[in-house]
Amino acid sequence: MLSKNLLEALNDQMNHEYFAAHAYMAMAAYCDKESYEGFANFFIQQAKEERFHGQKIYNYINDRGAHAEFRAVSAPKIDFSSILETFKDSLSQEQEVTRRFYNLSEIARQDKDYATISFLNWFLDEQVEEEAMFETHINYLTRIGDDSNALYLYEKELGTRTFDEE
């Protein structure tokens, strides 16, 4: 059985994952508005991944005999000055998610809830990948700078991204 404190934190994180999906869709909308369909696709796929994470937490809460609670999702940032800004904001968002999963893991450890610790390890591994991915994209975009040909090619590459739940 999940402790009240752990259940509250899991519900908070589940809702935060759905907020992250909204934030990535807002970034996709910005990219579409600026005619960057490849970058828009990248963020749409990222939003799908965040919804998958939310669903994974939802399933876990219910599998543990508790109740997943959905809350209002606040409006995400919608104005960006550049593609680079969307990726920098994404990295900040992922760093916040990592911090939140560390906090969840600490609560589970204090509760000696080893099943939840095991469950959360998947997310911690995922966060290492997410942060590294966004750091790489930021490095590439910074290196590209104002080179429109390089940006075009990079956008086309990211436009091929898909999300597979496997």
Curated annotation (Swiss-Prot):
Chief location of this protein within or outside the cell: cytoplasm
Catalytic reaction(s) noted: 4 Fe(2+) + O2 + 6 H2O = 4 iron(III) oxide-hydroxide + 12 H(+)
Keyword Signal in record: no
InterPro entries in the record: Ferritin (IPR001519), Ferritin-like (IPR012347), Ferritin-like_diiron (IPR009040), Ferritin-like_SF (IPR009078), Ferritin_DPS_dom (IPR008331), Ferritin_prok (IPR041719)
GO BP of this protein: intracellular iron ion homeostasis; iron ion transport
Domain of life of the native organism: Bacteria
Iron recorded as keyword: yes
Subcellular localization: Cytoplasm
Keyword annotations: Cytoplasm, Iron, Iron storage, Metal-binding, Oxidoreductase
Residues annotated as binding Fe cation 1: E17, E50, H53
Catalytic EC class: oxidoreductase
Gene Ontology cellular component terms for the protein in this record: cytosol
Residues holding Fe cation 2: E50, E94, Q127
Protein role: Iron-storage protein.
Protein family according to the UniProt entry: Belongs to the ferritin family. Prokaryotic subfamily.
Name by which UniProt lists this protein: Bacterial non-heme ferritin
